[in-house]
Regions:
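Chalcogenol-based redox active-site neighborhoods
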Residues: 1-148
Length: 148
């Protein structure tokens, strides 16, 4: 896992933006100059992940007031992310969340941050990245342990 005080690995990947648009060139470096909470989660359409993402989404305004951008990453495709957003919360979806979800089908991003579970998906990990792109704080949880 990358450590605090080190530069956050940059990446360019497909993503679903808050308005639902799919882009193929979402890049972490575009957020230099503001804080970023980059968080990894195992998979879309699972039991614990929607609750974590919806909890983050409820606090987006608080993050924005502090000039902090939330960004989620999993090994799902951008199309799966889009379908998850379109699925009603009552049916295991997440609805129109207000932060980007990055697709990491190749698991290069997950690997560059050192948060890949031996069975393939990302562990539950969060990174606080400062305005200069340096990691200031990290948390890492095994798959069965949710975040609060």
């Amino acid at each position: 896992m990358v450590s605090i005080c080190s530069e956050a690995p940059n990446f360019k990947a497909p993503a679903v933006l808050p308005e639902g648009t799919i882009v193929n060139d979402f890049e972490l470096a575009n957020y230099r100059g503001q804080y970023v909470v980059l968080f990894f989660y195992p998979l879309d359409f699972t039991f614990v992940c929607p609750s974590e993402i919806l909890a983050h989404d409820k606090r987006v305004t608080e993050f924005e007031q502090r000039n902090v951008q939330l960004i989620g990453v999993s090994m799902d495709s951008q199309f799966t992310h889009a379908a998850w957003r379109k699925t009603p919360i009552s049916k295991g979806g997440i609805g129109p969340i207000k932060f980007p979800l990055v697709a990491d089908l190749t698991r290069k991003i997950i690997g560059s941050y050192g948060v890949q579970h031996p069975e393939g998906p990302a562990l539950r990990a969060s990174f606080l990245i400062d305005k200069e792109g340096v990691i200031q704080h990290t948390t890492l949880n095994n798959l069965p342990i949710g975040r609060d």
